[in-house]
Amino acid sequence: PLTRIKLQLAFIKDKDMSNKLSEDVSEMEKMLNEYLQFASKRSSEKSEKFDISELITNTINKYENKNIIFDSNSKIIFTGRKNLIRRCLNNFIDNSIKYGKNVVLNIKKGLNNLTITIDDDGPGIEEKQYENVFKPFYKIDKSRGDSKSSVGLGMSIASDIIQSHGGNIKLEKSHLNGLRVRISLPF
């Protein structure tokens, strides 16, 4: 169906309208591909033991020239679906970089759980929207200054990943005056 819509767009004489509709179709394709990719990995990936501190370090290393601080010399072995945890971290780090200039990650190992916090100095999110951002296709109000395209699935998928590992995510005001994402996983 999307291919047929794309073909029909070529016949629209109003180029501005055609371009806007084409962007909508591209966004829809991106959304569907993102969800299908998540659903496929979720059903096929097996749990494994891995060093979650190393996973965080490797994830951060792809963000060259970004001010991200993560100081962890301790090896923390976690059992879970590594690629899904990486995807979750990517979603939150991408958002932190998108809205802030400085990002600080921390990891703490408790007796029964593991806590990962991601803080940024961006504009944050209003407390009344904390629960809504985890709903599929939810987009934060345009007044937040988001000029970049978003499908509205990243936070929902990240939440599903953490919940599938028996954990939870909480949003809070960051000490950097932006947003803090607190991920808690059973250990």
Where are the predicted features?
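Short alpha-helical Gxxx[C/S/T] motif in the catalytic ATP-binding
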Residues: 154, 158
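Conserved catalytic submotifs in the C-terminal HATPase_c
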Residues: 69-80, 108
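Conserved DHp (HisKA) dimerization/phosphotransfer helix of two-component histidine kinases, i.e.
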Residues: 17-65
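Acidic ATP/Mg2+-coordinating residue in the GHKL
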Residues: 120
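Short conserved segment of the HATPase_c
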Residues: 125-138
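Conserved glycine-rich
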Residues: 166-167
